C-alpha cells in the first residue's frame, strides 16, 4: 500500500491518469491525497470531478479556492468569470451529487502517524497545529451545514480583514480562516496577508515573507504538503515543506509525490493542460522524507 499526494489538477485529468498509471496506482490498496483546486481553468473539470468521485474511497482531499468558487457558483451566489471552465459542471445532471461530495471535503488534513499536514495554500506562522485544525473545522462545519453554507459562501470573498484576530465573529472570521488556508502566499510574522503578490520567493513586498519562511513559525518541525503557488515550480528550499503545484494548467507539469519516501514524478503538460508523452522522476530540495526534529 502506497500513499501519494498530487498537485493542483485544475481540470487536467489526462496528466493525473498518466501519473497514476506510471505508479500502478491501485484504488483498492493505495491512497491519493489531493491538495485542492481540483477544477477550473483546465479542459476537463467535469470529467476530473467524476473520475475522483468514482474513486472517492481512496482519496483524501482538501479544498482550494477554485473548489470553493465552484460551490458558490453552484448555489448561484457567485457568477462565473470569463476565465472559468465550470459551466459544464453546473449544467451536468449529476452536479448536485458532485457538489454534495465536494462540500464534505476538508480544509486541512493531518496524518498523526506520519506527522504530516496537507493544506491548499498554507498555515499562517502564528497558528500552532492544534489551532490550525480547530479553525479549519469551523469552516468545514459551515460547508456541511445547509443553513450555514449560503451565508458562508456569500461572505467568503474579499481580502479584509488581512490579519487574524481571535475575537472575530461570524462570516468575517470564516473569511480570514479561508483566506489563510486557500489563498495565502506572503504574510508578515504576525500573519498579516498580502494577497496581491503571486510570483516567486524573491517578490515578497517589504515586511512580508512566504508563510513558511518565518523563523518563529509555530508549525516548524511539522511536515506540510501544499499546492496553490505555481510560480514556485515545486521549489521552496525549506526542510519539511513540500510544494506540489507545478503549473500543469499553465503549460508546466503535474507532480505526484510518494508521501512516505518524498520521491516525485512529473508529467509535462501543454498550454491547455493536456499530458505530453513524458513522465520523468523529479528531484527537488523541497521533498525531504521527513521534517527536521
From Swiss-Prot:
One of its GO terms (molecular function) is bis(5'-nucleosyl)-tetraphosphatase (symmetrical) activity. Coiled coil: none annotated. Gene3D superfamilies: 3.60.21.10. The keyword Cell membrane does not apply. It comes from the Bacteria. It is an enzyme of class 3 (hydrolase). Keywords: Hydrolase. Hydrolyzes diadenosine 5',5'''-P1,P4-tetraphosphate to yield ADP. Belongs to the Ap4A hydrolase family. PANTHER family: CYTOCHROME C5, PTHR40942. This is Bis(5'-nucleosyl)-tetraphosphatase, symmetrical. The lineage of its organism: Bacteria, Pseudomonadati, Pseudomonadota, Gammaproteobacteria, Pseudomonadales.
Amino acid at each position: 500500500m502506497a500513499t501519494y499526494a498530487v498537485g493542483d489538477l485544475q481540470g487536467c485529468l489526462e496528466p493525473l491518469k498518466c501519473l497514476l498509471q506510471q505508479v500502478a496506482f491501485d484504488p483498492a490498496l493505495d491512497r491519493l491525497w489531493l491538495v485542492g483546486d481540483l477544477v477550473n481553468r483546465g479542459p476537463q473539470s467535469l470529467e476530473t470531478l467524476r473520475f475522483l468521485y468514482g474513486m472517492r474511497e481512496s482519496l483524501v482531499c482538501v479544498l482550494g479556492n477554485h473548489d470553493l468558487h465552484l460551490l458558490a457558483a453552484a448555489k448561484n451566489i457567485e457568477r462565473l468569470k470569463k476565465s472559468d471552465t465550470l459551466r459544464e459542471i453546473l449544467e451536468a445532471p449529476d452536479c448536485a451529487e458532485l457538489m454534495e461530495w465536494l462540500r464534505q471535503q476538508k480544509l486541512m488534513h493531518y496524518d498523526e502517524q506520519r506527522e504530516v499536514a496537507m493544506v491548499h495554500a498554507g498555515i499562517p506562522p502564528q497558528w500552532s497545529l492544534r489551532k490550525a485544525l480547530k479553525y479549519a473545522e469551523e469552516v468545514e462545519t459551515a460547508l456541511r451545514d445547509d443553513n450555514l453554507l449560503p451565508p458562508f459562501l456569500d461572505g467568503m470573498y474579499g481580502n479584509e480583514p488581512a490579519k487574524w484576530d481571535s475575537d472575530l465573529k461570524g462570516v468575517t472570521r470564516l473569511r480570514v480562516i479561508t483566506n489563510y488556508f486557500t489563498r495565502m502566499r506572503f504574510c508578515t510574522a504576525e500573519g498579516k496577508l498580502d494577497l496581491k503578490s503571486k510570483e516567486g520567493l524573491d517578490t515578497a513586498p517589504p515586511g512580508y515573507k512566504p508563510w513558511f519562511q518565518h523563523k518563529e513559525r509555530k508549525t516548524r518541525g511539522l511536515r506540510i504538503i501544499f499546492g496553490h503557488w505555481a510560480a514556485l515550480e515545486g521549489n521552496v528550499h525549506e526542510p519539511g515543506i513540500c510544494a506540489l503545484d507545478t503549473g500543469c494548467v499553465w503549460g508546466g507539469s503535474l507532480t505526484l509525490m510518494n508521501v512516505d519516501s518524498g520521491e516525485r514524478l512529473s508529467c509535462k503538460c501543454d498550454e491547455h493542460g493536456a499530458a505530453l508523452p513524458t513522465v520523468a522522476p523529479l528531484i527537488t530540495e523541497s521533498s525531504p522524507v521527513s521534517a527536521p526534529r
